[in-house]
Amino acid sequence: MRVLAAMSGGVDSSVAAARMVDAGHEVVGVHLALSSTPRSHREGARGCCSLEDARDARRAADVLGIPFYVWDVAERFRQDVIEDFLAEYAQGRTPNPCLRCNERIKFAAVLDRALALGFDAVCTGHYARIQRGPQGLELHRAADSAKDQSYVLGVLSQPQLEHALFPLGDSLKTEVRAEAAARGLAVADKPDSHDICFIPDGDTADFLRSHLGAAPGDIVDSSGRRLGSHDGAYQFTVGQRRGLRLGTPAPDGRPRYVLEVSPVTRTVVVGTADELSVTGLTGVRPIWCGPPPDAPLECTVQYRAHGAAAPAVVELRGDEVDVEFRAPVRGVAPGQAAVFYADTRVLGSATIARTRRAAVGS
């Protein structure tokens, strides 16, 4: 089988490519250039996709003895990921750019190009598992629950899964690092990237401010009482507690959280933890890993990248998905993905459009 190994320059993608070589496949390494002005880690950047990352990927390919190329996808990435990121924040939503990159870049633009060039599959270093079930391929959580990335892969459809390979799905991260060291890969001890790759300093608010400009407005409580001001509602996300800079302290002394962001009125609504609870949500643009459900579905729903999944009933209603949680949950932000699970299996996903807030005291 001809396999295109997407190599970021990190330990995970390097070991994933190595395992494909060991399996006897014809492997070609490709590093994705996501920016027209590649940066250096020496500039203080902590994310991925720097010049050093490209060099690390090439060195790993050399150790493995496989051909290596750099593919320029910067313009597509700018349009489909960065511009989408900015547009979502401008509308008061909180997007997940890693999920969008998987959906529109790695398993769309890159996969399409790979298939056109005669490759059979794209291999990545994601921690997730693909298994064949009675109705086709199934996407499952990884064996390493701390590293599981099935949430950001929940946008993949059955045709995309047919051409995806995740060799690390059954491994622990500690095992992957040990294997990299044993193979003589220089990236064995390279730190993981935790930042949004196009915001390497981690300052999302500054990035948004520099691209969207100042848009001052009020911070109010759920009754409409003014508590403070801001210079851009897009800097806030539902569930946020830090950095609110309230000019008027809450009369009860309890912490305040962001409940709602309204870019049209430039208003940020804050409230107590109890007011943050929601009983359900409406999702749009559903994507199913298999056949869509024809009846209400009992499952668990993960509604943010690093959160637990909550029991819920999911019902497909035309082009939307209705989710009713079995118990109120907190921190559900429009723009994020709701990913539906049956135990470890990913059933599908949808983008959170609206939430239903619980009555205080419920």
Swiss-Prot record:
Coiled coil region boundaries: none
Enzymatic class: transferase
Catalytic activity: S-sulfanyl-L-cysteinyl-[protein] + uridine(34) in tRNA + AH2 + ATP = 2-thiouridine(34) in tRNA + L-cysteinyl-[protein] + A + AMP + diphosphate + H(+)
Positions of the record's site feature: Interaction with tRNA: 126, 336
Annotated TM spans: none
UniProt entry keywords in alphabetical sequence: ATP-binding, Cytoplasm, Disulfide bond, Nucleotide-binding, RNA-binding, Transferase, tRNA processing, tRNA-binding
Function: Catalyzes the 2-thiolation of uridine at the wobble position (U34) of tRNA, leading to the formation of s(2)U34.
UniProt-recorded name of the protein: tRNA-specific 2-thiouridylase MnmA
Organism: Acidothermus cellulolyticus (strain ATCC 43068 / DSM 8971 / 11B)
